[in-house]
Amino acid sequence: MPEIPEPEFSEAGLPKAVRSETASLSWLEDAIPVATRFDDPYFSLKGGLEETRHVFLGGNDLPARLQDGFRIAELGFGTGLNLLTLALAWRPQDPEGAGLLHYTTFEAFPMAVGDMARALRHFPEAAAISAPLLAAMSAGETRFRLPGIAVEIVHGDVRDTLPAWTGRADAWFLDGFSPAKNPEMWGETLMAEVAHHTSKGGTFATYTAAGHVRRALAGAGFEVSRLPGFAGKRHMSAGVLR
């Protein structure tokens, strides 16, 4: 049998097979990346860390629920800021460093490592954790460890990759681009897959309160709540799988 060559990696640190799908960006104030495909920023102009803490941590009752073996899944890895914010929250919960969280994230349009670094340099609070993240990404790794967190990045169309995933999450970060601009990420079929890959009593949180998204999640089995949004945004959504 002929030897299968090792995959080659681009200068951006991504396998060349997904190079053509690398996110195309513009920038606001040289600090906030905007996906040109969807004309949508990757995080709030009023504070990325604070937004993640309010929406994805607060909406999932984290870090209070975090414990060894806890599993988080995410739709939309982007800059990796949600992962870094989680890591910052986990450290005080596990001061001896004995526990391990599991973090699986699904991303169709990976950001080039140089662009990730450009976005994350504006969050010095997370610098100690972003450095090993960027190193792993530069090496083309899709499975690696940060302090206290085992990370798995799944590239490809989530409508294909999520059904093939064998895991279940205790908490979901639903962070795709706006439902109005990226409706494929928020349809009934995909929200049913999210529920299928959620442990009983597991939760989700998302920045959007769009009615059709809430109905899709409720139809999939979640008890959905509408909560105050971040930084003047009227509402966000969170829920529990019953």
Language-model segments: residues:
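A short glycine-rich, Lys/Arg-flanked "PGG" loop and its adjoining helix->strand segment in the class I
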Residues: 185-200
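Class I S-adenosyl-L-methionine
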Residues: 209-242
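Glycine-rich SAM-binding Motif I of class I
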Residues: 80-84
